[in-house]
Regions:
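Mg2+-dependent phosphoryl-transfer enzymes with acidic/Ser/Thr/Gly-rich catalytic loops
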Residues: 1-5, 21-22, 185-264
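Asp-based phosphoryl-transfer active-site loop
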Residues: 4-18
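Short, structured coil segments at secondary-structure junctions
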Residues: 57-59, 66-67, 169-172, 226-227, ...
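Conserved acidic, metal-coordinating active-site core of Asp-based
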Residues: 96, 100-214, 218, 235
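Residue-level signal for inorganic ion chemistry
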Residues: 32, 43, 67, 150, ...
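Active-site phosphate-binding/coordination module
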Residues: 18-121
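Short, acidic loop-to-helix structural element flanking the phosphoryl-transfer center
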Residues: 21-37, 82-89, 130-137, 190-202, ...
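Short active-site oxyanion
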Residues: 36-40, 60-61, 149, 209-210, ...
Length: 264
């Protein structure tokens, strides 16, 4: 099997539990790129956070963010693919979340929009510097054009309840994916990491059989199934492990370095 592109989820995969890139992972990524292999991030995070870590690692191709809804060139800052909600859908969605007093954030380009700022609701972003967060208060409707993703944050164990409620209201007008157990990512319909990865592969003229995809969570299932070599972290959920062709070490044990050294 010849691997030409490695796609890495961030939280629980590329990053350890401290939300940092272990040195061994960084060195293994450099070795892979030195061999002419493309290495990218495929994350549910917003573009700015994905780009922040990709630039730290000098990654050599566009990155996939917003669970596949955005594929952005690091050098030009331009999107080679971007999916948006319809204005009607996102307006209705934000309105319902406001009425329910659910804490939400939504992304337009590299900007995060919130009703009010509460950094306790951003635990995954604690190691990303320079985030642009805009507090909009009650006047959200002027910030509903070109929205790529909305995230519901709930630290009280009610994410599944919220997901079921929104699925009942919106049906196939949105995509719903639990991410970390305390957040839920909402995307335009039909979007997942496999979609974003396929757009990147097409851009790079690489066949899916030449892709290695690594992840740990619910939102990684599609790309792990799509890639020629699907890799689960030892800390992955069972659903991911069950479809992966290989299980690597835990994210706190340099699992990405281990799998790169094994297959590259």
């Amino acid at each position: 099997m010849t691997i030409k592109l490695i796609a890495l989820d961030m939280d629980g995969t590329l990053l350890n539990r401290q939300k940092l890139v272990p040195e061994k992972n960084a060195l293994a990524i450099k070795r892979a790129m030195d061999k002419g292999i493309y290495v990218t991030i495929a994350t549910g995070r917003m573009p700015a956070s994905a780009s922040y870590f990709a630039k730290q690692l000098n990654m050599n191709c566009p990155v996939v963010s917003c669970n596949g809804g955005v594929v952005k060139d690091l050098n030009t800052g331009k999107s080679i693919y971007e999916a948006h909600f319809s204005k009607d859908t996102i307006t209705e969605l934000i309105s319902i979340c406001y009425q329910k007093n659910w804490y939400i954030r939504w992304y337009i380009g590299d900007t995060i929009y919130v009703r009010y700022v509460d950094m306790d609701m951003f635990p995954a972003y604690k190691t990303t510097k320079g985030l642009n967060i805009v507090e909009v208060g009650e006047d959200f409707e002027k910030y509903t054009e070109n929205v790529t993703q909305l995230v519901v944050c709930n630290l009280n164990g009610k994410i599944q309840e919220i997901q079921d409620e929104l699925a009942n209201i919106f049906k196939d007008r949105i995509g719903l994916q639990q991410n970390t157990g305390y957040t839920m990512d909402i995307t335009p319909p039909g979007i997942d990491k496999a979609v974003g990865l396929s757009k990147l592969a097409q851009y790079l003229q690489i066949d899916k059989s030449e892709i290695m995809a690594c992840g740990d969570g619910d939102n990684d299932l599609a790309m792990i199934e799509y890639a020629g070599l699907g890799v689960a972290m030892e800390n992955a959920i069972d659903d991911v492990k069950n479809i992966a062709q290989f299980i690597t070490k835990d994210c706190d044990e340099d699992g990405i370095a281990y799998v790169i050294d094994k297959f590259i």
